[in-house]
Amino acid sequence: MSKFIVIEGLDGAGKSTAIGFIKKYLDSKSLAAVYTREPGGTKVAEELRSIVLHNDYDEEIHPDSELLMIYAGRIQHYRNLIAPALTKGVNVVSDRFYWSSIAYQGGGRELGVDKLNVLNETFLKDCQPDLIIYLDIDPAIGLARAGKVGSPDRIEKAGLAFFDRTRAVFKSLVAANHNAYEIDASQSIDVIEKEIYAILDKYF
């Protein structure tokens, strides 16, 4: 049976590297998978991603607008890419899903987790990942890592207090969900790889 796997974490936590390990694992077992990301994943969702992260317009994006654009993209992503793949028996691995909105917008932007829960219950009730791996990193370290890769986007410019709030929500979500696992992303790459494989062994 196909699995929906989500990698979560702050910017600079090493999600792309972790997804590479998951791909290596699934390939070793000859298991088909689609690899995708949020915000984005489909043409429409990628357009919304560009607005949310870069905003080339001379107009401030209100936090509520940011949230709803992300959810519009997420609905497109799930209905047009994720759900069809799972129906065909293909595994899906996503760099972020709705936990990122709960943590970043609900916590970081201080919009409130209750508002996010209403959106999830209304639009994504049947969109539950089978496995969520959260990579935990100190925000200062994560932002320093992300800064070495490229220019910071709108969200990466939000400041340490924003990311401290975001991290706290992520950790509370892990604690409340039986299908979620936290990995210390400050460990060596080899240790992280082994921990990811140990988690995947429980599902495949």
Curated annotation (Swiss-Prot):
It comes from the Bacteria. The keyword Metal-binding does not apply. The keyword Cell membrane does not apply. InterPro entries: P-loop_NTPase (IPR027417), Thymidylate_kin-like_dom (IPR039430), Thymidylate_kin_CS (IPR018095), Thymidylate_kinase (IPR018094). GO terms for cellular component: cytosol. Signal peptide: none annotated. SUPFAM superfamilies: P-loop containing nucleoside triphosphate hydrolases. HAMAP family: Thymidylate_kinase. Belongs to the thymidylate kinase family. This is Thymidylate kinase. The lineage of its organism: Bacteria, Pseudomonadati, Pseudomonadota, Gammaproteobacteria, Thiotrichales. The gene is tmk.
